[in-house]
Amino acid sequence: MVVKVGVIGTGAMGRAHIDRLTNVLTGAEVVAVTDIDHEAAEAAVRDFHLNAKVYPDDTSLLQDPDIDAVFVVSFGGAHEATVLKALDTDKFIFTEKPLATTLEGAKRIVDKELTKSKKVIQVGFMRRYDQGIRALKEKLDTGIIGAPLVVRASHINPNVASNYSNEMAITDTLIHEIDEMHWLLDDEYTSIQITYPRQSAEVRNEGLHDPQLATLTTKKGTVIQVLVHVTAQYGYEVKLEVIGETGELQLPNYGLGPILRSNANQQTAVEMSWINRFIQAYNTEVQEFIDQVAKSEPPVGPSAWDGYIAAITAAAANRSQKDQETVLINVAGTPTFYQNKNAIHA
């Protein structure tokens, strides 16, 4: 079966997904696109040589009975409304993060999906598909370093767009680590605190504090510290270190070429964009989603519930930004519907 896909949003990320669906992966065909910028949608069809319809909006695209799955790749504030409308159809849904920009919006999506016969939503938390992070989790799960005691991570960007706000340090940047650590440790958060170190002189965005340090605690007692530094200038990096009872696991910043040692110096390249760093992870997550849709089986990747957990934690982090105090996190138990990766209602 060739999965027929409609893409909602043809900006940079939408075009990247169209490219991989059309030219890199197997089993899918982009048959419809839409964007609030109609010319951008037309350009995507033209540039990628698609045999696809261009719809004026998401509502009309979602009414197309020939579409098996939709990719929601619009700006974050539009995700909730589109996903809720998509849940009124029989289509599978791949939505980029965030699931919704508010806690209440994420809860509305979860509540609506719970009325369906099976899971249909996958959220684009691609970190789970990174080969290095997966390998680290596999090692951790063997118990080779004992129980995880402390996790240290960094999320470094060279710079950010002029519309990047202080809140987006959480909802656009830290959100990746929020989901990653929840999955990596198989644990629930109990609190989060955001603190502001010395302000970087490189910050140009009004109201933005950079860097920021997030400290999270979990039910099992692990303490997680994440440095978010989005005006670092020198490049893009993610770092991860897990300190256990009997050892440590570290994620190398791999894939950037050889390390050169010469004339008493050591050099290696530093990536400037997250796109190249995680291209393999994006390809793997989308291929897995397409393969599940082709079998008419529920997605096995990050679920709407995972998106809801991330939204709860992000909302607490945004509150902590205001006074840099610790904010408690209390999440109800995971519904049975979301406990089984292949959850289907009887």
Curated annotation (Swiss-Prot):
Q: Which GO terms describe its molecular function?
A: inositol 2-dehydrogenase (NAD+) activity; nucleotide binding
Q: Which GO terms describe its biological process?
A: inositol catabolic process
Keyword Manganese (UniProt): no
Q: Name one Pfam family in it.
A: GFO_IDH_MocA_C
Q: Which domain of life is it from?
A: Bacteria
Enzyme Commission code(s) on record: 1.1.1.18, 1.1.1.369
The record's HAMAP family line, in alphabetical order, gives: IolG (MF_01671)
Stated name of the protein: Inositol 2-dehydrogenase/D-chiro-inositol 3-dehydrogenase
Q: Which organism is it from?
A: Lacticaseibacillus casei (Lactobacillus casei)
